[in-house]
């Protein structure tokens, strides 16, 4: 009986402490403009537009300004829009805004020991490990893998060009980016045939996990309920377990291959030189007890999720935009072909990144119109602060409104038109594709190399056309990344 009383008292105490903390945050944030909420704040309104959440935030930005407040259940949220505001928060006041907002349902998955949702010194150590493999020198070494994957993709597209029938490209572009990250992590890649074999391969599992991980969670919006319920679906945990098992097998395979490589002094998987991946340094962290084996699995999953869907979706949107703007596609193709030296059959990012000016402009415009992380990853204020005269309470969730920063007339003329020439002035401060601050995208150098290389190979070698008279749909939907609708194109080889 005493135990029951103790449990009851503890629960009541937790409840009142939570309510008191929420009241404090609401009181401090109350002067910030934003949509009025009734039952459950703005949760119901947001739930109705969940696939177009970015459009709702654009609407609210136009109405309430660059700093506005949203109540999502019991979750106090402030949304920041525009580079000047984002800079003030995430650069000028970085100590206050650096922390990642930690969703309650992530605790049961990795105890906040992954790459995405960790904080403090633990995250700083992980970041230093990851960034040590993202230097210009390391990215240059990755070029051969990116070029190899681009070649495999072009060989596949050659088959479709010969057939001359419309087909959907999304899945191929997603696997292109998945394979590069798998090579980056584990030194492996997978054939494009695995997209259609209906198996439970890692490719299939990653794609299923991407769909499930973005599903809404009750405990995110009502954290007080987390001790009493686990609102992740059984399917989510089953897929997460499958993905974890694939990661474990890849890690063991990599360790065995590395051992064999050291014994035989041969490269892994037939590479021309010894393969070094980020996994080597992460394994050292495990050996030194700075991260656990379970954390290693979570970190690998985070890198996969962060690096695959984003690039794949970006390339899909790039093709859609250039099919809908045929004259821009032709200009880009000519610029690529004319800029490459005679005898160069394939694009080299380190050689041509500054040598094909129109390609650079087109990539910037793709990043602007179709930012992968449309609302970024949520942050949390570590103390009370003030931005543009608005007081924001400690513990408030902070959203970087990247989509509105890129798609509002407040920052760009004709924001919904695809105009690469707008970037000739090179005002990069307006673009926040990779987020702002010390926790911006760690893989942006690799992503840029992937996107530049893929677009140079695709548009330098193929002409993409729309088999329909209706323009391709470029209205993305909200998910882990801005999702491009499936689209059909016809392609033909350029001479």
Curated annotation (Swiss-Prot):
In Pfam terms, one family for this protein is p450
User: What's a single GO CC term here?
Assistant: membrane
Question: Lineage in the entry?
Answer: Eukaryota, Amoebozoa, Evosea, Eumycetozoa, Dictyostelia
The similarity comment for this entry is: Belongs to the cytochrome P450 family.
Residues that bind heme: 441
- Residue ranges spanning the membrane: these are 1-21
Q: Which domain of life is it from?
A: Eukaryota
Name the CDD domains on file.
CYP1_2-like (cd20617)
- Stated EC number for the protein is 1.14.-.-
Q: What name does the UniProt record give this protein?
A: Probable cytochrome P450 513C1
* Primary enzyme class: oxidoreductase
Alphabetical UniProt keywords: Heme, Iron, Membrane, Metal-binding, Monooxygenase, Oxidoreductase, Transmembrane, Transmembrane helix
Q: Cofactor(s) for this protein?
A: heme
Location in the cell: Membrane
Q: Which GO terms describe its molecular function?
A: heme binding; iron ion binding; monooxygenase activity; oxidoreductase activity, acting on paired donors, with incorporation or reduction of molecular oxygen
Bilayer topology reads:
Single-pass membrane protein
List, alphabetically, the InterPro entries matched: Cyt_P450 (IPR001128), Cyt_P450_E_grp-I (IPR002401), Cyt_P450_sf (IPR036396)
């Amino acid at each position: 009986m005493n135990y029951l009383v103790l449990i009851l008292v503890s629960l009541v105490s937790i409840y009142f402490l939570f309510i008191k903390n929420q009241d404090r945050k609401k009181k401090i944030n109350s002067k910030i403009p934003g949509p009025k909420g009734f039952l459950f704040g703005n949760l119901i309104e947001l739930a109705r537009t969940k696939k177009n959440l970015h459009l709702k935030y654009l609407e609210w930005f136009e109405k309430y300004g660059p700093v506005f407040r949203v109540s999502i259940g019991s979750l106090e949220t402030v949304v920041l829009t525009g580079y000047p505001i984002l800079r003030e928060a995430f650069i000028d006041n970085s100590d206050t805004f650096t922390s990642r907002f930690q969703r309650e349902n992530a605790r049961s998955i990795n105890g906040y020991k992954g790459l995405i949702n960790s904080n403090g010194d633990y995250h700083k150590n992980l970041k230093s490990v990851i960034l040590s493999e993202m230097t210009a020198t390391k990215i240059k070494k990755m070029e051969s893998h990116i070029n190899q994957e681009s070649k495999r993709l072009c060989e596949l597209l050659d088959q479709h060009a010969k057939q001359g029938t419309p087909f959907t490209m999304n899945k191929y572009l997603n696997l292109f980016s998945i394979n590069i990250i798998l090579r980056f992590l584990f030194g492996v890649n997978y054939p494009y045939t695995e997209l259609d074999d209906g198996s439970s391969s890692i490719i299939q599992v990653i794609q299923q996990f991407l769909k499930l991980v973005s599903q809404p969670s009750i405990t995110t919006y009502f954290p007080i309920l987390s001790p009493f319920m686990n609102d992740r679906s059984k399917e989510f945990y089953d897929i997460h377990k499958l993905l974890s098992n694939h990661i474990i097998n890849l890690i063991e395979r990599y360790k065995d291959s590395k051992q064999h490589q050291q014994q035989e002094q041969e490269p892994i998987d037939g590479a021309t030189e010894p393969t070094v991946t980020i996994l080597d340094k992460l394994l050292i962290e495990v050996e030194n007890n700075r991260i656990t084996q379970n954390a290693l699995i979570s970190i690998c999953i985070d890198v996969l999720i962060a690096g695959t869907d984003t690039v794949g979706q970006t390339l899909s949107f790039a093709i859609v935009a250039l099919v809908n703007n045929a004259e821009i596609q032709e200009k880009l193709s000519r610029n690529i072909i004319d800029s490459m030296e005679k005898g160069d059959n394939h694009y080299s990012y380190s050689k041509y990144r500054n040598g094909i000016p129109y390609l650079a402009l087109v990539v910037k415009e793709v990043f602007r119109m179709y930012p992968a992380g449309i609302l970024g990853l949520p942050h949390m204020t570590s103390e009370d602060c003030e931005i543009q005269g608005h007081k924001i309470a400690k513990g408030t969730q902070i959203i970087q409104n990247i989509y509105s920063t890129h798609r509002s007339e407040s920052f760009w003329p004709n924001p919904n038109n695809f105009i690469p020439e707008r970037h000739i002035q090179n005002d990069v401060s307006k673009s926040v594709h990779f987020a702002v601050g010390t926790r911006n995208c760690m893989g942006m150098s690799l992503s840029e190399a992937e996107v530049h290389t893929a677009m140079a190979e695709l548009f330098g070698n193929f002409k993409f056309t729309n088999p329909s008279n209706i323009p391709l749909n470029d209205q993305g939907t909200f998910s882990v990344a801005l999702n491009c609708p499936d689209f059909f194109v016809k392609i033909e080889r350029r001479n």
